[in-house]
Amino acid sequence: MTQLIITYQSDSKLEESEVFLSELNRIKKEEDKFAKFSSLSDLRAIVKKGEFRIVSIYLSSGSILAEIFTFEFLKEFYGVLDFGSVLKVNILALDSIDKVKAFERNLLFSGFIKVKKLKGDGLNSSDSDFEIVIKAEKPSWKPEEGKVLVDDIDLEGSVPDIKNYVPLGQGKESCKSKERACNNCNCGRADLEKEIGIEAARKVYQEKVETGTARSSCGNCYLGDAFRCSGCPYKGMPAFKPGEKVSLANAEGDANDRTVDMNLIHEEKVDLITTTFDDDGSGVSNVQSKGGVLKLNI
């Protein structure tokens, strides 16, 4: 495995070091190449001359490291290296641990992976006599290899059919066995409890579920949306004549025929009927008081 060994041209302290010379003699093989660089363009030209799996850089101090290998420098240097290359930075003397930590962060931000500090804080051991050895790798894959094309995904098959959706909650049938309305009630029972009391509302909902009967509290259902209540089961349907047969669709998509009978009964002392409607159009009635009213049956 061919190795490229490089040093900084102006790093005079390194060249005077006997530790570096002995290290160079120890690791250098015949197929390895030794070179010096003074700028990024020099380093780019040196790396492009051959296919090097390992690039070892030797520096005398952390100050030299911070001066040369800035984030912008590392980004450019990252693009020069072959995929799968290993970068080893050897520092002779540790004069600033903060600069070394900043260099490690810049390696990660530049795209390198598996950044390790092999010496200097007792984390790992190394055969090198240098005080700090930092190792990093350039990924062996290209960024495009991890990209998934949208065309490869079967969007239609990944989205379940809306007909098979199960609605949240148990539905109005669960109200029959409950003592009182749910905390997040949206079927109207909570409002009915406030008006007529908990026990009376429970009985009304029992009758409502068992019989499915409903009565109008306004008598305006047949006139159209402009005259209908917000919870009217005929909301969205055109106006119709009293007594006309109207077909409503329930939650499952089936159709239930309901006869709308808006016949008026003469005014007399009768019970006042309060009615609450569900989203599916069913309604319940409760006797509240005595008064002169018109009874309207739906």
UniProtKB/Swiss-Prot annotation:
The keyword Transcription regulation does not apply. Its cofactor is [2Fe-2S] cluster; [4Fe-4S] cluster. A motif (Cx2C motif 2) lies at residues 229-232. Residues 1-143 are annotated as: N-terminal SAM-like domain. [2Fe-2S] cluster binds at C175, C182, C185, C187. A motif (Cx2C motif 1) lies at residues 218-221. Keywords: 2Fe-2S, 4Fe-4S, Cytoplasm, Iron, Iron-sulfur, Metal-binding, Mitochondrion. GO terms for molecular function: 2 iron, 2 sulfur cluster binding; 4 iron, 4 sulfur cluster binding; electron transfer activity; metal ion binding. GO terms for cellular component: mitochondrial intermembrane space. Component of the cytosolic iron-sulfur (Fe-S) protein assembly (CIA) machinery. Required for the maturation of extramitochondrial Fe-S proteins. Part of an electron transfer chain functioning in an early step of cytosolic Fe-S biogenesis, facilitating the de novo assembly of a [4Fe-4S] cluster on the cytosolic Fe-S scaffold complex. Electrons are transferred from NADPH via a FAD- and FMN-containing diflavin oxidoreductase. Belongs to the anamorsin family. This is Anamorsin homolog. It comes from Cryptosporidium hominis. The lineage of its organism: Eukaryota, Sar, Alveolata, Apicomplexa, Conoidasida.
